[in-house]
């Protein structure tokens, strides 16, 4: 975030330009680089009887274990009305996890999905209680939900450092696809989803996408004026995606304070976007430099993950090495513009999610060592 100490006049001129940028100038730089994890699943896992263990085999609460492993921040998602899915990740469940992090002195990122369940590039289903609303009504819905959740946290002593307006919004957010009874998208004969409501779809309704995002940004600032409000896209290696999507927001008058990226080399290769993990990481680091310069703001890798196979030490060691590289180059190769790296759901069982970083019985694998030995 800080420029080099030389060329003070150039820095001042550049700062003046930034005030005109879509990326709102951030407050005084925090000197820390943040190492974090999204552990939103933890309370649901605990309720099923799952336990977590430290390096020495002692049972530990998951948030405390993350801190013990060298992390200083957590990321936690929130859904609008997940009552059909056990009420996990509602505002009350969010508060439980936030208080654990707060009491450990860890920074908190809140990830608004603006859906009753999962929101990602394949689906951004409009909450059931908002369905059929007009654009103006939906801006009010979004703002009211955002303020309700954040005020609830504030009233309980929680002050999130970062707030995401949407989750992986490459195609915008608040647009619905035809889904089955379990909430998963139904695919047609060609393997495609069918969009049934396109309110905030970035390609179909770009102005509405920007307007909805702006409503979320303003709502965040109304409760926590000093919070860092983020736009979050997937495929951090894809410069063209970021130029297009952020350009849509910029053209629509939306603002943000920081750009969040997802980086999953495994999925990049699985989807045929890149041939190998090393190129994926290289392209992501280059994109961090690119978007931070083009849009004048800092960046975070808010999701990453690597293949875990506790029966194959070589796979685990490769994951540790790749994560260490991501952290190291985010610190050393981005001109100070990348401010953190967060692992997505490392505590998950491999049988539940194969890009976690723990064993089936709740012990951290060597992948987690990267958070403490990334410089080696």
What are these regions (language model features)?
Residues 56, 60-63, 222-229, 236-312, ...:
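Glycoside hydrolase catalytic-domain groove-lining segments
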Residues 35-39, 74-76, 108-112, 161-165, ...:
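Hydrophobic faces of well-ordered beta-strands that scaffold small-molecule active sites
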Residues 1-7:
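Positively charged n-region of N-terminal signal peptides that target proteins for export
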Residues 47-51, 118, 180-191, 195, ...:
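Aromatic-rich peripheral "rim/lid" segments of glycoside hydrolase catalytic domains that contact
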Residues 40-42, 79-81, 113-117, 165-170, ...:
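Active-site beta-loop-alpha junctions enriched in small/polar residues
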Residues 28-65:
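Boundary/entry segment of secreted carbohydrate-active catalytic domains
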Residues 19-22:
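C-terminal motif of bacterial Sec signal peptides marking the signal peptidase cleavage site
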Residues 64-205, 209-228, 234:
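Substrate-binding cleft and catalytic face of glycoside hydrolase catalytic domains
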């Amino acid at each position: 975030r800080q420029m080099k100490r030389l060329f003070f006049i150039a820095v001042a001129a550049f700062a003046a330009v930034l005030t005109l940028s879509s990326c709102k100038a951030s407050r005084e730089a925090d000197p820390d680089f943040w190492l974090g994890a999204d552990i939103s699943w933890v309370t649901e896992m605990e309720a099923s009887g799952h336990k977590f263990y430290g390096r020495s085999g002692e049972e530990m609460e998951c948030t405390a274990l993350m801190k013990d492993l060298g992390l200083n921040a957590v990321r936690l998602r929130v859904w609008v009305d997940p009552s059909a899915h056990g009420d996990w990740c509602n505002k009350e469940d969010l508060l439980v996890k936030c208080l654990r992090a707060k009491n450990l002195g860890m920074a908190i990122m809140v990830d608004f999905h603006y859906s009753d369940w999962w929101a990602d590039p394949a689906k951004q289903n409009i909450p059931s209680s908002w369905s059929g609303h007009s654009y103006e009504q939906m801006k009010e819905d979004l703002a009211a939900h955002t303020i309700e959740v954040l005020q609830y946290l504030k009233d309980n002593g929680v002050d999130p450092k970062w707030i995401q307006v949407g989750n992986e919004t490459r195609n915008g957010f608040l647009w619905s696809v035809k889904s089955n009874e379990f909430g998963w998208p139904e695919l047609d004969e060609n393997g495609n989803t069918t969009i049934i409501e396109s309110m905030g779809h970035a390609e179909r309704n770009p102005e509405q996408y920007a307007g909805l995002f702006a409503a979320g940004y303003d709502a965040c600032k109304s409760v926590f004026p000093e919070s860092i409000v983020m736009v979050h896209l997937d495929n951090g290696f894809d410069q063209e995606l970021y130029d297009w999507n952020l350009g849509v927001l910029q053209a629509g008058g939306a603002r943000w304070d920081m750009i969040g990226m997802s980086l999953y080399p495994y999925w990049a290769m699985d989807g045929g976007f890149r041939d190998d993990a090393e190129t994926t990481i290289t392209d992501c680091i280059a994109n961090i430099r690119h978007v931070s310069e083009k849009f004048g703001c800092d960046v975070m890798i808010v999701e990453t993950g690597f293949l875990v196979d506790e029966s194959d030490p070589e796979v685990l060691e490769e994951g540790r090495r790749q994560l260490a590289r991501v952290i190291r180059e985010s610190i050393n190769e981005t001109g100070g513009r990348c401010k953190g790296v967060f692992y997505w759901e490392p505590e998950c069982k491999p049988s539940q999610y194969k890009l976690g970083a723990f064993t089936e019985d709740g012990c951290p694998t060597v992948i987690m060592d990267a958070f403490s030995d990334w410089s080696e």
